[in-house]
Amino acid sequence: AIRHEVPFILDSAYGGPFPNIVFPETENLWDNNTILCLSLSKLGLPGLRTGIIVAHEKIIRAVTAANAIVSLAPGSIGPGLVCAMVEDGSILNLSDQVIRPYYQEKVKQAVTWVTAAMGDLPCRIHTPEGAIFLWLWFEGLPITSETLYQRLKQRGVLVIAGEHFFPGMQDPWTHRHECIRISYAQDAESVQAGIAIIGEEVARAYDESVSKTD
């Protein structure tokens, strides 16, 4: 990208330096050819939808001009909040001392609930490395993750079917139909209840498969 003078756009929705919802130790990536995009929504104020761009000054000026045209009246609350935090460095303390520990505690609790809800079901949890999601793999799931999504939706639980994360694949790899992504960002009661329902529907799918073979 540098050799061809093509800017490298990095959408760092959960990475460092803000909001830094990344649990393993990492190094922040940036140079003059990188456009690093961050979001103020992880402060718990998603309605502000304030974007933070770290880039070369000439790119910042171009984005500012474009934004003035596309968004005729952009909100000023978000920029007003974040400007002072960037100037005094408190935005980094907020990431490391408040936001990341908060989600680390939530993911630990979510893993405990998943383990309890799935019991003896063939469920594996992808190592949580950050963001606000858990990936669950149900090996040998008798239905597709899309079908599981539809069943869960009928019961008021929303997940993301794993097969949508494998675009363009032509070979019949069953793994892509056996995984779902769940969010643990909501309140504890809702997350625990949703995980319990997921366990019930997955158990139902396996039970139906056994019944058909008997």
Predicted regions and their residues:
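PLP-dependent class I/II
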Residues: 1-214
